[in-house]
């Protein structure tokens, strides 16, 4: 426990909060070719690689992911949620924050039903999260 005198000489430092999705907090000025501090809820990007990944220890699956070059020129790995997708290399996608706990290095999700990404087909419940239209009838 520090004394009052020690605290007067050197006060306590406040904790620096680290962002869970740092690529969304950076903008890009293409005229000056400089990165700017400009937070956004989502960002647009181009898929440079689409593939599958195996999750961490207790789980077993082939999780779909895409490597995305964002509009601020940062390249990130994003998870493709839902069953089946239509993404290929050079597809334009929208990403949001949100990590996938069992995939190391995946801090972003691709928004289904936005830009080139189609919604999940034949989805009845939780449709808004997967860009699925309301079924007829």
UniProtKB/Swiss-Prot annotation:
One of its GO terms (cellular component) is small ribosomal subunit. Pfam families: Ribosom_S12_S23. GO terms for biological process: translation. Signal peptide: none annotated. The keyword rRNA-binding applies. Residues 1-21, 33-57 are annotated as: Disordered. It comes from the Bacteria. Disulfide bonds: none annotated. CDD domains: Ribosomal_S12. PROSITE patterns: RIBOSOMAL_S12. SUPFAM superfamilies: Nucleic acid-binding proteins (SSF50249). Keywords: Ribonucleoprotein, Ribosomal protein, RNA-binding, rRNA-binding, tRNA-binding. GO terms for molecular function: rRNA binding; structural constituent of ribosome; tRNA binding. Part of the 30S ribosomal subunit. Contacts proteins S8 and S17. May interact with IF1 in the 30S initiation complex. Belongs to the universal ribosomal protein uS12 family. PANTHER family: 30S RIBOSOMAL PROTEIN S12 FAMILY MEMBER. With S4 and S5 plays an important role in translational accuracy. Interacts with and stabilizes bases of the 16S rRNA that are involved in tRNA selection in the A site and with the mRNA backbone. Located at the interface of the 30S and 50S subunits, it traverses the body of the 30S subunit contacting proteins on the other side and probably holding the rRNA structure together. The combined cluster of proteins S8, S12 and S17 appears to hold together the shoulder and platform of the 30S subunit. This is Small ribosomal subunit protein uS12. It comes from Streptococcus pyogenes serotype M1.
């Amino acid at each position: 426990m520090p004394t009052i005198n020690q605290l007067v000489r050197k006060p306590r430092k406040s904790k620096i909060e680290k962002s869970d999705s740092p690529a969304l907090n950076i903008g890009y000025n293409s005229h000056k070719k400089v990165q700017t501090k400009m937070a956004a809820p989502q960002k647009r990007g181009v898929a440079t690689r689409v593939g599958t990944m195996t999750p961490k220890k207790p789980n077993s699956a082939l999780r779909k992911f895409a490597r995305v070059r964002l509009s601020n020129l940062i390249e990130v790995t994003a998870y493709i949620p839902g069953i089946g997708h239509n993404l290929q290399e050079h597809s334009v996608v929208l990403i949001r924050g949100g990590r996938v706990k069992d995939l190391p290095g995946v801090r972003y999700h691709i928004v289904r039903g936005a830009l080139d990404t189609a919604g999940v087909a034949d989805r009845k419940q939780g449709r808004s999260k997967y860009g699925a239209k309301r079924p007829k009838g």
